[in-house]
Amino acid sequence: MDSPSLLEVLQVQQVEKLISPSLRFILAYFTHRYPRFLLRAYNSFDGIYLLVKLLLEKSQLKKWNATSVERRFQLKRVIAVRDSSIIAEEFPQESESATSLNGIDVLKKLFLTYCIPYLLEKCESLTTVKENHTAVSILSLQARDKQKGALSVFYSKIKILLVRLKKILHFVFRLIRKSNTYLQWLYYLLYALGKTPYTNLADHILRQRVIYNVENIHSRKLISTREKSSLLTSIADHSMEGFLIIIQLIDWWQSNNYESHLKKGEVAFTELAPPKLPFEINVSTTDICKICGEKIKNPAVLSTGFVFCYPCIQVWLQRHPFKCPVTNLELSRKGESFWRLMI
């Protein structure tokens, strides 16, 4: 099983993190125009988003063994099994059924990935609200103790304990969030070094890993016929896919700052004569990777215009920096020499 690179994993997580702020911004824009109808929905955005996200991702995981963003990047989830590649070659059907997610795996994935972060965020926000008033509350309660009887003193002490408990809980939640951030970077490092097949703690607990969905790449017609089985599911899938494409385009445009380049008249193109190829191109070789010699999987295009397997061109550029494997020409845009094709 071919695992995606760390760059692809980070890209998936980046797009995943952009969904909620983008939807919140859109809702805030329309709430400003129609507050009477949308203000209540905007105030309850986190809960509504979690509910819709759970319903959508549950159907995606059951149907495709992947979340909506992972499916967009042609990835899928499998249960980690020892010597899975050897078992897949000898017993392909048994291996596929053994590594596919069942209903319990889907529910555990949803709970760890979406519900727990939501609960931690809400608990931290609830304790943060009272944190600024902690000192004032304790002093005011202690002042009232001197003026009231024993029963009121008892209640005041309980309130003081609750205020201090909230302060401790707020510190604990912040510590958990920071520890999770450091642990996430540790998983990134181990994954990049090939020491673990998991990209985060939740996947490690669930024993789920992410791999390329080769079947999804080479069987578009089968997918399109399966999607027509449910009209509502099909509409949700296509709407989500279109929304993700828009998010990626906006993020790509802003991160590359193309607007300022266009205003300044800066052009990143290099005028080169057509290269002389060392082989004759025909119909039978157009879908063959020029590096591994096999049919192209997970296509990626180089700045010279040739298409290769995404893992192949990554390894090639690490061994031969800024050189095209076909033309042997130096790449003009060394910072962004190749792009993955989403077809």
UniProtKB/Swiss-Prot annotation:
Its main location: membrane. The chain crosses the membrane at residues 6-33, 38-62, 103-140, 147-193, 239-266. SUPFAM superfamilies: RING/U-box (SSF57850). It comes from the Eukaryota. One of its GO terms (cellular component) is peroxisomal importomer complex. It is a multi-pass membrane protein. Zn(2+) binds at C289, C292, C309, C312. GO terms for biological process: protein import into peroxisome matrix; protein import into peroxisome matrix, receptor recycling; protein monoubiquitination. Pathway: Protein modification; protein ubiquitination. Keywords: Membrane, Metal-binding, Peroxisome, Protein transport, Transmembrane, Transmembrane helix, Transport, Ubl conjugation pathway, Zinc, Zinc-finger. The keyword Transmembrane applies. It is found in: Peroxisome membrane. Residues 34-37, 141-146, 267-343 are cytoplasmic. A zinc finger (RING-type) spans 289-328. Belongs to the pex2/pex10/pex12 family. Component of a retrotranslocation channel required for peroxisome organization by mediating export of the PEX5 receptor from peroxisomes to the cytosol, thereby promoting PEX5 recycling. The retrotranslocation channel is composed of PEX2, PEX10 and PEX12; each subunit contributing transmembrane segments that coassemble into an open channel that specifically allows the passage of PEX5 through the peroxisomal membrane. PEX12 also regulates PEX5 recycling by activating the E3 ubiquitin-protein ligase activity of PEX10. The three subunits of the retrotranslocation channel (PEX2, PEX10 and PEX12) coassemble in the membrane into a channel with an open 10 Angstrom pore. The RING-type zinc-fingers that catalyze PEX5 receptor ubiquitination are positioned above the pore on the cytosolic side of the complex. The RING-type zinc-finger is degenerated and only coordinates one zinc ions, preventing E3 ubiquitin-protein ligase activity. Component of the PEX2-PEX10-PEX12 retrotranslocation channel, composed of PEX2, PEX10 and PEX12. This is Peroxisome assembly protein 12.
